[in-house]
């Protein structure tokens, strides 16, 4: 009887919730690079913590977001040299992967990519048993940042929408921003509160806003908030790779 193979591909962000031990580790997960010079290269390391060899391949994609924070990706192999692009990592061993940016050097704003390490499934022994083979993909984030680039987050509007508030933000700067550690101060007649930490991150979802990008964040309207005249002040707390 032929072995029936089921594949389950899990992104790294879901592993903790799946209750499955990591087959391997990738570091770093987020890093900044320059468009040219020595800083246009970086190294990520793939550590095989499994008891068996793993086969990997590395893929580059451009990362984009719409105003709701929904992510999309575009192939970007022409913007990078990845070495080695494929490989076998033995148990307990670490494979270094060099990332060389070779895209446009004259950037007027930062560009964000994912460099994804994909585990390639292998054939299971033909022992007559069925099973599930889990393969893990780790998407690291590579930001190509021109010299002197800065994020500038502006509050465009705060609009009541039933029991919610629609907060519209715009990045008027020329560098990406990660909004995860930031907060929003709401104030009105006889009322003030700060939305931060888990409440903010839950409403935010995807935390990235790219240069020139707009984000619309739906906030739960506080019970004691006035019906009119509510003002929002966004406080950017930047994270460092």
Question: What residue ranges belong to the model's regions?
Answer:
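Intrinsically disordered, low-complexity Pro/Gly/Ser/Thr-rich segments with frequent PxxP/GP/PP motifs
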Residues: 71-105, 193-225
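Bacterial N-terminal signal peptides that target proteins for export
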Residues: 1-10
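Solvent-exposed coil/turn segments that connect beta secondary-structure elements
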Residues: 61-63, 94, 100-104, 118-120, ...
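A charged, solvent-exposed segment within the mature domains of Sec-exported extracytoplasmic proteins
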Residues: 121-194
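Terminal connector regions
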Residues: 102-152, 223-241
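Beta-sheet-dominated interaction scaffolds and their linkers
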Residues: 23-50, 86, 148-164, 168-170, ...
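Short acidic, flexible loop segments centered on an aromatic residue
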Residues: 51-74, 174-193, 236-238
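N-terminal signal peptide c-region/cleavage motif recognized by signal peptidases
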Residues: 16-21
